[in-house]
Amino acid sequence: MEALIPVINKLQDVFNTVGADIIQLPQIVVVGTQSSGKSSVLESLVGRDLLPRGTGIVTRRPLILQLVHVAPEDKRKTTGEENDPATWKNSRHLSKGVEAEEWGKFLHTKNKLYTDFDEIRQEIENETERISGNNKGVSPEPIHLKIFSPNVVNLTLVDLPGMTKVPVGDQPKDIELQIRELILRFISNPNSIILAVTAANTDMATSEALKISREVDPDGRRTLAVITKLDLMDAGTDAMDVLMGRVIPVKLGIIGVVNRSQLDINNKKSVTDSIRDEYAFLQKKYPSLANRNGTKYLARTLNRLLMHHIRDCLPELKTRINVLAAQYQSLLNSYGEPVDDKSATLLQLITKFATEYCNTIEGTAKYIETSELCGGARICYIFHETFGRTLESVDPLGGLNTIDILTAIRNATGPRPALFVPEVSFELLVKRQIKRLEEPSLRCVELVHEEMQRIIQHCSNYSTQELLRFPKLHDAIVEVVTCLLRKRLPVTNEMVHNLVAIELAYINTKHPDFADACGLMNNNIEEQRRNRLARELPSAVSRDKSSKVPSALAPASQEPSPAASAEADGKLIQESRRETKNAASGGGGVGDAVQEPTTGNWRGMLKTSKAEELLAEEKSKPIPIMPASPQKGHAVNLLDVPVPVARKLSAREQRDCEVIERLIKSYFLIVRKNIQDSVPKAVMHFLVNHVKDTLQSELVGQLYKSSLLDDLLTESEDMAQRRKEAADMLKALQGASQIIAEIRETHLW
């Protein structure tokens, strides 16, 4: 098990070379208040004076101290890493050793070896001032120091700045918060052991070290308490209850030590002498606890705790390193290798982008969105949901009222009163309604164009990671595709405009669907006319027979008798037969007298009997209405524009409006169905499919030129740096994986 700590030290070195903190390695973190004796405990464990000492805040940067045990008989003292597969970055190992029993090495000084521990202390001070300044500033950047000695056990310790309350010197006002966050960053590592240092001449219940330790380790499974300055307690008091755990119990134990005083340091008292005096003090003051306290016992305890902790953390550490190695390998692959054949690389990237673009439209892309519709699926949604619902929301009679229809009918007849509804009025009104379908159709083209623009960004972000290496090539491809889409937009709009113009060019009243609708409406209108005449004709006939009676004396309403109804039906049948005969023979009759070429097609559907004309005439007699009639007392100006007057429509006007409305609605639905079917087809042919078919040839023609190779395949400034960082991290992870793989299972027990 002793071999586990050097393994962790090697892993620490490997990851320090790349400045990575992604792997949390097992280590011992020393925490405590300022001047509580943290650095003195570390020096006692090392057995040499190597840390800066003094009053106030001395430790101003984290110090990661690795203690490496070497055999005393080893005459050739080196870094101990000549045969290690994982070595420090750019390390050139010395061919000769160092003739000294103990030596140190800093990570930031590369291969320089220090045999003078005063020089080590001076280098710590210099490195601290280089980053933290020469006053009282604190920095979170750690200093890495490795000590080789036959007098130490294998340990990895972290000395942190002491907790303080009031800023001094050039320290910021929030120095307490900064140091607290720094300590929490190290002790929050679940693979660390917390060494909580508290001075014996203070109340343990007020220990800041134990308080902050419990925040991250409430169960105390990885916290060991150290009581320093046992020789400085008030006379008549001792730390027996504290060391026995009766005041505050600590699961891993409480160990007391005696530090060198500042006077001892000034008198150059060695650590060896200090440890000997410590043992004598413990035998005298705490004889029953002497064998479970002191610096030597603390070192052995820490070594044992660290080894067991490493054993527990090792399986998870192996898994973590393997996962990270796979991730960085994938990341490095996405960055690609340096370009050798630029011509082949350019053609490959162009082809891949064109393929991914077309696949995104077809729905066979490698990277498929799950949060929203994109590509061909969104185009389908635009066709059948957005465009379809928009067309269905267009009212066939929107913008038309009864006055508009009557005005169109009158304008279509010219100066002659019309007996039938002119076909010209129907065409005029239905074309006006069909024209309203053009705007949503053009909007459909615009939406598809926008989606095809979005596909460019989708392919750049998800499908072709290689393009991120070459930002100029990426911009050039986007520009070419955008120009291609922009060129196809007017062509597609023109085709959609023509589709609507085609419908406007010829109103096909012989359309099969429209003929069926006309037949149904003819039967419906004929039936309504029969019913209306059956109710109203008897009263009109009676008023005609008694024409000498003033109309004002006629009854307001009269129910038709059965005899009158039979008479009305007989007259209606005779009238219909007479009209049919006249229409077939072409002679005599009202229809023959007023027939016009433009209205012949409507006669079968808009037949008007004499009885109905008589009824309309009777209805119009009581209320003679002139359009735009002047008020009494005013002169009539023939140059005035006629103003429509609101009035109750006659039966014929109601019938004409109803016929026109139904015909417009029927024909509009036919045209809308045609537009809903033909516009998506036109968009697919003139825009989507054309871009798919010509995209690659357009890209090759515009970009595949020898004069553009060097410029287009210029990598971004940070791409080379990111590739190098990923390669270094991958190398470190592979080295760490090799180190862990060399651990024998027997080492764990």
UniProtKB/Swiss-Prot annotation:
Glycan-linked positions: T598, T599
Region described as Interaction with GSK3B: 461-698
Skewed-composition ranges (Basic and acidic residues): 568-581
Region described as Disordered: spans on this chain: 74-93, 536-604
GO function terms (MF aspect): GTP binding; GTP-dependent protein binding; GTPase activity; identical protein binding; lipid binding; microtubule binding; protein homodimerization activity; small GTPase binding
Domain GED positions: 657-748
EC number: 3.6.5.5
Official protein name in the record: Dynamin-1-like protein
Originating species: Bos taurus
UniProt lineage: Eukaryota, Metazoa, Chordata, Craniata, Vertebrata
Gene name tied to this protein: DNM1L
